[in-house]
């Protein structure tokens, strides 16, 4: 396995561990999620380039579109929560509260 694939898998693993460790704040969770999406995008781009299959080039673009939508929704949720509560703790996101 080439060293670049191992580096990308390591970046994904570190982002996943960061997501599991720093899950009390929404901003740190969003940053870790973006790191995971970036490593998945790079991995899918490298796989599409190595496969030489024309339809495989659509997968990284679709992943990038979903990552942009996820970032926009996450940032709007972060702004809404910080305007309402004054901080970005995830325990404020309970659906049982009114």
UniProtKB/Swiss-Prot annotation:
Segments crossing the lipid bilayer: 1-21, 29-49, 58-78
Function: Core subunit of the mitochondrial membrane respiratory chain NADH dehydrogenase (Complex I) which catalyzes electron transfer from NADH through the respiratory chain, using ubiquinone as an electron acceptor. Part of the enzyme membrane arm which is embedded in the lipid bilayer and involved in proton translocation.
Organism ancestry: Eukaryota, Metazoa, Chordata, Craniata, Vertebrata
Compartmental location: Mitochondrion inner membrane
Family membership noted in the UniProt record: Belongs to the complex I subunit 4L family.
GO terms assigned for molecular function: NADH dehydrogenase (ubiquinone) activity
Protein name as catalogued: NADH-ubiquinone oxidoreductase chain 4L
Major subcellular site: mitochondrion
Substrates-to-products reaction catalysed: a ubiquinone + NADH + 5 H(+)(in) = a ubiquinol + NAD(+) + 4 H(+)(out)
Cited Pfam families: Oxidored_q2
Signal peptide interval: none
InterPro entries: NADH_UbQ_OxRdtase_chain4L/K, NUOK/Mnh_C1-like
Record's keyword annotation contains NAD: yes
Quaternary structure and interacting proteins, as annotated: Core subunit of respiratory chain NADH dehydrogenase (Complex I) which is composed of 45 different subunits.
Keyword terms of this UniProt record: Electron transport, Membrane, Mitochondrion, Mitochondrion inner membrane, NAD, Respiratory chain, Translocase, Transmembrane, Transmembrane helix, Transport, Ubiquinone
Listed EC numbers: 7.1.1.2
Gene that produces this protein: MT-ND4L
Stored Gene3D superfamilies: 1.10.287.3510
Membrane topology reported for the UniProt record: Multi-pass membrane protein
A GO cellular component entry from the record: respiratory chain complex I
Enzyme category, top tier: translocase
One biological process term in Gene Ontology: ATP synthesis coupled electron transport
